[in-house]
Amino acid sequence: MKYEAVIGLEVHAELLTDSKIFCGCSTKFGSEPNTQVCPVCLGLPGTLPVLNKKVVEYAVRAGLALNCTIANFSKMDRKNYFYPDLPKAYQISQYDLPLCSNGYIEIEVEGGTKRIGIKRIHIEEDAGKLLHEGTDGSLVDYNRAGVPLIEIVSEPDISTPEEAYQYLVKLKSILEYTEVSDCKMQEGSLRVDTNVSVRPVGTTELGTKIELKNLNSFKAVQKALEYEIKRQIKVLEEGGTIVQETRRWNEAKGITEPMRTKEEAHDYRYFPEPDLVPIIVTEEWKEEIRKTLPEMPDAKRERFITQYGLPEYDAKVITSSKKMADFFEKCASNYHSPKIVSNWLMGEFARLLNDTGKEIDEVPITPDMLIELLKLVDDNVISGSIAKTVFEEMFFTGKNPQIIVEEKGLRQIADEGELRRIVRKVIEENPKSVEDYKKGKEKALGFLVGQVMKETKGKANPQLTNQLLREELSK
């Protein structure tokens, strides 16, 4: 019997507001524990919450960008459960009347696009953070308690781990473009839970779902789903039954492990939050927010293809990150070849960003500095290979490319007399390659060019080197 997977994703994104959802405490990441708290976010008796208007605005902004229907009337609810990081013993969230619903994202799949439905987007407060240090107990940092979140719940329209990955990449891109969240998974401002079940192909009844947690990257989501789908199919094929539970992804072992039985909605005893008035979003306010929406990733991709002549692949990669797209556009509007700019962004720049785990705005290279480097190559001051060395130095030090070239003596050897002397020396030292070239083996010329580059530590002008080698070899 063949099985298919049914996958739904729940994404929590912290909103980029300066203050918390129900009080004036700062949302700044990385402060000393319990320094951004007050009686409201600590849940002390007698305190009352006041809803931050910016939270509603950002949630509506995300909802509009994700093609949702925005509710004119919604309310907050209490979700009751006990956990040390939840000071009030309930979380203020939304239950039956979410702020946004019935949206969608379109992702690229083999042979076209696929629409993934978004069931709902609701606003809620974050919990604190448990710190497990030593064996005597756990500590709680309440700085995060009350930080505003949106929870984006997809429909179970996702069929494969690859589709889940593509959905998350697209969703992150849209949230970054709308500037409602910075989506930094390493700081916990974007968190993903997945629900997955399997069923025989051709049936419509859903199987028993498993929730997966501890997913620290989109690749981890993909790997965990791949493992869990295989595990569930194996259980069913062996005549077993799937137990509804929450499982944890163990990155080191590459497996999912049982965590706890899954709660149902009734376990939380939801009821309307009595201390907050309902949320009213007028059509006028909706339209005001809609007018502030920026150009979205898909529209920007199409424009980059037509305006800058980029191949579709380049445009897709560059526009997947708003920061990368902005950097590219600043370069491309001041440099003669947008394609060369995209090659650098997708090549050396992307490699160093991946190696260091940094974002493009966290490194000291500006668009003007990259253009200056590219012009040094255009003007034959340095070669393309030396440019990569210079760029790496720029990446880590923020130094100007011209200064690096002068300090390290990296200027290209373009003096014909000096280069001809080196070319003759290389020809003399490599008689076999000379013989091969004269027999028609063009590869031998490449070897000789490489030897000249080695001799000059990469500083020989490649075009002039080629020309002089051909001249000397034809004698």
Curated annotation (Swiss-Prot):
Record-linked Gene3D superfamilies: 1.10.10.410, GatB domain, N-terminal subdomain (1.10.150.380)
NCBIfam families: gatB (TIGR00133), PRK05477.1-2 (NF004012), PRK05477.1-4 (NF004014), PRK05477.1-5 (NF004015)
Tagged with keyword Nucleotide-binding: yes
Keyword Ligase: yes
EC number: 6.3.5.-
The protein's name: Aspartyl/glutamyl-tRNA(Asn/Gln) amidotransferase subunit B
The protein's role, per its UniProt record: Allows the formation of correctly charged Asn-tRNA(Asn) or Gln-tRNA(Gln) through the transamidation of misacylated Asp-tRNA(Asn) or Glu-tRNA(Gln) in organisms which lack either or both of asparaginyl-tRNA or glutaminyl-tRNA synthetases. The reaction takes place in the presence of glutamine and ATP through an activated phospho-Asp-tRNA(Asn) or phospho-Glu-tRNA(Gln).
InterPro entries per UniProt: Asn/Gln-tRNA_amidoTrfase_suB/E, Asn/Gln-tRNA_Trfase_suB/E_cat, Asn/Gln_amidotransferase, Asn/Gln_tRNA_amidoTrase-B-like, GatB, GatB_C_1, GatB_Yqey_C_2, Gln-tRNA_amidoTrfase_suB_CS
Signal peptide: none
Family to which the UniProt record says this protein belongs: Belongs to the GatB/GatE family. GatB subfamily.
Organism in which the protein naturally occurs: Caldanaerobacter subterraneus subsp. tengcongensis (strain DSM 15242 / JCM 11007 / NBRC 100824 / MB4) (Thermoanaerobacter tengcongensis)
GO MF annotation list: asparaginyl-tRNA synthase (glutamine-hydrolyzing) activity; ATP binding; glutaminyl-tRNA synthase (glutamine-hydrolyzing) activity
